[in-house]
């Protein structure tokens, strides 16, 4: 598929997600990085978002809970180019009833080429990257070209 360049502003839209067994770790991580996260627009799946907002005082737009459709809502926002970064503290040791939704979320994040952190260490690397607070361009699918080819 052909690609085009998508501009991501210095002020990012960041999705924060955590499986149940990882929620406290994400809360602690968010508290440690509150100053770095404050200038950005924050989204989260339902329970995680409400817990993060309560514990950190950050303004977080909480979507539905992951198993109730929140992962798919985030995937939709990624496809609409409204999410720039996904931080997902994922538990690889426990199956969740919405594992297919999680797989779909990861697939969409990969299709739209956004940075993804799946644990504390990768989130630390992402947050400390020189590009984190800069405007950048990323290659994304040329959906308009794709659609034009399909309709020709």
From Swiss-Prot:
Pfam family example for this protein? Answer: MGS
**PANTHER family in the record:** METHYLGLYOXAL SYNTHASE (PTHR30492:SF0)
Spell out the Gene3D superfamilies in the cross-references: Methylglyoxal synthase-like domain (3.40.50.1380)
Provide the reaction this enzyme catalyses: dihydroxyacetone phosphate = methylglyoxal + phosphate
Provide the MGS-like domain boundaries.
6-152
Residues bound to substrate:
19, 23, 45-48, 65-66, 98
Which protein family is it in? Answer: Belongs to the methylglyoxal synthase family.
The entry's protein name is: Methylglyoxal synthase
The record's EC number reads 4.2.3.3
- Does RNA-binding show up as a keyword for this record? no
Which GO BP terms, alphabetically?
methylglyoxal biosynthetic process
Name the enzyme group at the top EC level: lyase
Q: Which Gene Ontology molecular-function terms are recorded?
A: methylglyoxal synthase activity
**UniProt cross-references to NCBIfam families, sorted A to Z:** MGSA, PRK05234.1
Residues of the active site are 71
Q: Which GO terms describe its cellular component?
A: cytosol
| Alphabetic keyword roster | Lyase
Its biological function? Catalyzes the formation of methylglyoxal from dihydroxyacetone phosphate.
